[in-house]
Amino acid sequence: MTRTATLLSGILVCFASCAAPDSEPAMEEEAAPMLNTLTDEERAEGWTLLFDGKSLDQWRGFRSQETPEGWEINDDSIHYTGKVRAGDILTREQYGDFDLRLEWKVLEAGNSGIFFRASEEYESLWYTGPEMQVLDDAGHRDGARRETSAGANYALHPPSKDVVRKAGEWNQVGIVAHGNHVEHWMNGEKIVEYELRSEDWKKRVAASKFKDLPHYGLMDKGHIVLQDHSDPVWFRNIKIRKLD
């Protein structure tokens, strides 16, 4: 090694030791994100909350003006306890074209769902409303079949990617419905895309459990629904923006 190289090496060592303090200053922790709120920007874009963390005023039971027993506010969330058969809850307002965002979590082997454009005209909400599956894939038998796994258009369209988080963790999901075009999003990824009323749609429905339901997926407007499937489930940060 030359004398010049030795000198440069010493300078670099000195610079490194002098520049680095004995201990890093304490970093301020980032504030936890506010739950069940909207930013000014979101309000300006047309978003509205479907749950403010304080009341269930925007939700009710099937063919009822009351929220059924078994649904409550817990952990800043809309929570179905699983202790009684309560039935699904639905938004008081109906939506046609929309962008829906929310978060959900379930326990091990938990099962629930999110329906849209659902009608009370028929015997059950699932007779008309397509469902985005809510599921612990690892713990529930439906997770073994892609068409019924988390994020799927239940029993019809499987998710293209496996991005669901493990039981007990929050998943960020979205449903975008614009005319016949529908997208399912989960944890930042678009995982399902389909066209209502298309030949592909008709073929899939005809080969499914929905084959005898003539209005399935064909309502132009309907309710957003959170499903009672007997298992505990939590929903929070529920917001929607109309696209029509």
Give the location of each predicted region.
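Positively charged n-region of N-terminal signal peptides that target proteins for export
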Residues: 1-4
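Bacterial N-terminal signal peptides
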Residues: 6-16
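Carbohydrate-interacting regions of secretory-pathway proteins
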Residues: 18-244
